[in-house]
Each structure stands twice: as C-alpha cells, then as structure tokens.
C-alpha cells in the first residue's frame, strides 16, 4: 500500500491534545474581546457624561427616557405644525402638568416702589379758548405711560457733634458750674468712617451679589469715593468678629435644637493658612434646618479640611436626623439618625444612562424611573401634616422602595461601569435611604443643603479665594446671616443694616433675649417696613 493511501488515525485524547492550544487561544481572545468591549463601554460612558455635563441640561426634574412614540425634538415643529391652530391666549395657555403663569403686570413689578406723578398741564397762556375766547376747565387726566427710573446711589459724610451745657445758677451759687454733655450714638468702629449702611452695602454686594471687593473699589472710585479693598476687607472682618459673631452663635444654638439638620460642604482656598501651601484646598461646611422646620436656619463653618471630625465637633449635642449625601466622614457623628439623599441616588442612574438612551427597558432608565416615581409620590403630600405624611409613607411609599431594592439585587453590572456605581450607591446607602420612612418631617433628599450652599459656590467663582483664615471665618458668619435672612423671606441688605445698627447699642455681650429679637424669624424683625423681600 502506498504511503499516500495510508490513513492516520487519532484517539480522542490525542485530538483533544491537538486542539487544546487552539481552544485556549480562542478563549483568551474571547476574554480579551470582552474586556475591550467593557473598557469601550466604560470610556463611552465617561465621554457621554462629559458631553452631558458640558452641553446637556442640568435639571433632574424631567425624564430623560423617551418612549418609542415620542417625537424627536428637532422634528417637533414639522410634525405638529397646523396652520389652522388657534393662538393660545394669556388666560388659557397650558403646558404639560401645569398651567403657564400669566406674565407679571406693571403693577406687580412696581408694587414696592414709590410713585411720582408727572402731570403735563396746560400753561396759563393756553387756558383761553382760541375759538370763542372762553376759559378751559380741567375735566380729567389719563395715564399715558409709566417709566422705571434709576436714582444713582448718593454718599455723604455725617459729622456727629456732642453739645456741652453749663448751669449758670450753680456757677453763681457755688462757684462751680454743673456741666452736662450729650452722648452721640455708639460707633460701629472707633476712629473709622464705617457706618451700618456702608458696611451692609459692602457685605451685600460681596456675599449676596457676588461682587468682589476689588470690583467694589472701582465702583466707589467712579462715584468719587476713594475706598480701598483693604479697608473694606478690614470693615467686613472687624464687624463680623465683633458684632455679628454673637448672632451667628445664637443661630447655631437654635439649629442644634432642631429635629432635622441637612449638611453639605464645598471647597474653598485660603492663601495664608498655617502649615498649608497657598494652593491647598480647605472646606466650607453648611448646616441647615429641615424643610419642614419652623425656623429656617443656615450656618456656614470654615474648616481647614474635610475630616469627619469637623461635623462631629459642630454637631455635638445634636440627636436628631442628619441628612447628607453619603460621604463617609459624616459617619463619625454619633447619636443621630443618618438619612440619605434620593436626589444623589437618582443622579447616579442619570449618569449611568447610555448617550442618547431612548429604550425604556435599559437598567439605568428603570432605576431612574423608580427614583422619579418616589419624588412624584412625595410631592402629593408635601403640604400634609407630619403625622399624615408618615402614615402615607408607610402605606404607599414603602412598597415602592421594597420593590426597588429587590430589583437592585437582580442586576449584575459590569465592574467599573457607571451602572455599577448607581447600583452600589443605593445598596450601600439602603439603611440611610430608607430612614425617612419612619418620620414625617424628614425630606427625601439633601437638595435643601445643596441649594443653600450654592450662593457660596457662585460667589467663589468671582472672588476665587480667601486671603486669611479670619477672612474665611468672617465670610462664613456673613453668609450664615444673609442666607438665613433669605430663607425666612427677609431682604438681606435690610437685615444687615438692622443688626449692624442695633448691636452696638447692646454691647459686646448681648443677652439671649436681645439676640432672639434680632433673628430673621422674630416678629419684631419680620414686621419692619422694607424688611420683607
């Protein structure tokens, strides 16, 4: 038999041995391909989130998941166009879920402004009728238009003189005159031009309007006043430390007596701080009373770092519910009920959505809808009393959350993905996220704290940094007062003017009762003219 006709036979074991390298190679390639796909998806998530952060809308109130029958944004005009459609009137114009508000009238815009009438009357020379020689008589006047005018800020120097009197009779009878001298009002700062109105104006512009002192210096110069930024900084720090600090401490004591406190923090840079380089990051912490609290309080506190011992120290003596974003540092706070933030949980799902997601069944979309449903349920009982809200949560909200966490356990996301972040956040925070169900006065999110700290974040973009620790501490004091005033519906400048005018009369150690009468929620403050926003 020729060699070519011979058959080569292999046993099963030999065949397995021959293909083993090929099988191993295929398996290795499959694993490598899966890993590359996972990395690609992860990079696409990062890119999509970066584009969303830069170009997308920031609001979380609307759903980002479109059903198949929803129209494209860019085709909406062509799809809906109808030449026979009636124009909506101001009274009937409606949008999804609510009726559009009517435009504000001129009366509403100008209701808090003084009004001066400009009557264009006939001069005496024209009161004689050119047709019959009779005399014109006024039979009425008509409003033709209104104008909003600006009266530029004016400045002046007030010079206080005390008067001295001597008794003539005492001098004649005894040879010594009885002398009395009038007392001038106590100054805000000795040997300084600073007045309550000027310091209140500087503080309001910086801490409410976000105008840095360097820019204020230029504004003053245009008005003919040479007021340096260094002088203004000195005024702010001295007034905050000498006069406003007792109010700040009183507000803090009131805050620690509340049943619910929100907490958040953000970065601040302090140039001149011991044992720290100028470029290092410090922290501004924010503590606020709950949404359903009777007293709306916002307290800012400067600290050199983000250590958990900072909130632990600040909240010493507090034993209520603490609402945070899940930062582990807050776990050092003992004897409190830690409550989570569902807005953060929902945000995680939003970040996990694939770019341009339109499929209702995507896991991120499902998680997002669970959270959105929770917010919708809560909104229905926003005006209910505490007891009714607690019962509603136990009967209606609890089943939804039990379903949500059961669904979470069925998800097995890729490691390192945004989807894994969303799942892990909710599972790790389950106890904190469920805590609000046992209370009727605990909000479901930490949005209140985020909104309260936002003015500081916006202002920081303008003034960038604090020069010294004293400056940072003083900024915390002023921010606390103006944000607490705003939270209580009080106009910030009017409030600062009031307290800076009154505190010098109370001295360096005002009593609890005296400080309480200067709180933004006190009737004595709320009923003052021009104090309401």
Model-identified regions with their sequence ranges:
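Short, flexible loop/hinge motifs at secondary-structure junctions
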Residues: 1-193, 262-263, 290, 324, ...
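Catalytic center-proximal scaffold of phosphoryl-transfer enzymes
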Residues: 2-6, 126-128, 137, 162-166, ...
């Amino acid at each position: 038999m020729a060699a070519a006709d011979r058959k080569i036979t292999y046993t099963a074991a030999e065949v397995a041995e021959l293909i083993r390298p090929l099988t191993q190679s295929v398996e290795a390639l499959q694993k490598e391909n899966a890993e590359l796909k996972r990395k690609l998806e992860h990079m696409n998530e990062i890119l999509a989130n970066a584009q969303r952060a830069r170009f997308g809308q920031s609001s979380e109130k609307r759903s980002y998941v479109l059903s198949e029958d929803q129209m494209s944004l860019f085709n909406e005009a062509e799809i809906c166009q109808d030449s026979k459609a009636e124009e909506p009137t101001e009274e009937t114009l409606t949008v999804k879920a609510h009726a559009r508000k009517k435009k504000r009238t001129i009366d509403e815009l100008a209701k808090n402004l003084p009004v001066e009438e400009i009557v264009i009357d006939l001069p005496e020379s024209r009161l004689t009728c050119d047709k019959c020689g009779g005399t014109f008589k006024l039979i009425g006047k008509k409003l033709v238009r209104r104008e909003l005018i600006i009266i530029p800020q004016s400045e002046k120097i007030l010079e206080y003189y005390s008067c001295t009197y001597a008794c003539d009779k005492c001098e004649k009878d005894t040879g010594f005159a009885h002398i009395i001298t009038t007392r001038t009002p106590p100054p805000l700062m000795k040997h300084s031009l600073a007045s309550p109105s000027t310091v209140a104006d500087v503080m309001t512009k910086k801490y409410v309007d976000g105008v840095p002192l360097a820019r204020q210096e230029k504004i003053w110069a245009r008005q003919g006043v040479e007021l340096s930024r260094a002088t203004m900084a000195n005024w702010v720090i001295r007034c905050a430390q000498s006069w406003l600090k007792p109010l700040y401490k009183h507000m803090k004591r009131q805050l620690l007596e509340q049943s619910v406190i929100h907490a958040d923090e953000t970065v601040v840079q302090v140039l001149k701080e011991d044992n720290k380089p100028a470029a290092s990051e410090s922290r501004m912490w924010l503590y606020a009373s709950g949404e359903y609290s009777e007293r709306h309080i916002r307290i800012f506190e400067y600290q050199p770092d983000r250590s958990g011992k900072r909130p632990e120290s600040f909240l010493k003596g507090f034993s209520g519910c603490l609402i945070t974003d899940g930062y582990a540092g807050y776990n050092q706070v003992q004897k409190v009920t830690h409550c989570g933030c569902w807005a953060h949980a929902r945000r995680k799902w939003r970040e996990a959505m694939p770019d341009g997601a339109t499929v209702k069944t995507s896991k991120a979309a499902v998680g997002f809808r669970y959270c959105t449903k929770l917010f919708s349920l809560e909104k229905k009982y926003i005006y209910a009393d505490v007891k009714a809200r607690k019962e509603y949560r136990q009967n209606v909200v609890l089943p939804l959350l039990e379903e949500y966490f059961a669904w979470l356990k069925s998800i097995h996301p890729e490691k390192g993905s945004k989807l894994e972040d969303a799942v892990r956040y909710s599972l790790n925070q389950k106890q904190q996220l469920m805590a609000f169900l046992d209370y009727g006065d605990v909000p479901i999110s930490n949005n209140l704290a985020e909104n309260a700290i936002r003015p500081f974040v916006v202002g920081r973009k303008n003034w960038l940094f604090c020069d010294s620790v004293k400056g940072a501490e003083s900024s915390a004091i002023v921010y606390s007062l103006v944000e607490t005033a705003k939270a209580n519906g009080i106009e910030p400048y009017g409030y600062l003017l009031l307290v800076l005018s009154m505190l010098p009369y109370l001295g360096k150690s005002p009593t609890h009762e005296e400080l309480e009468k200067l709180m933004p929620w006190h009737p004595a403050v709320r009923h003052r003219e021009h104090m309401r926003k």
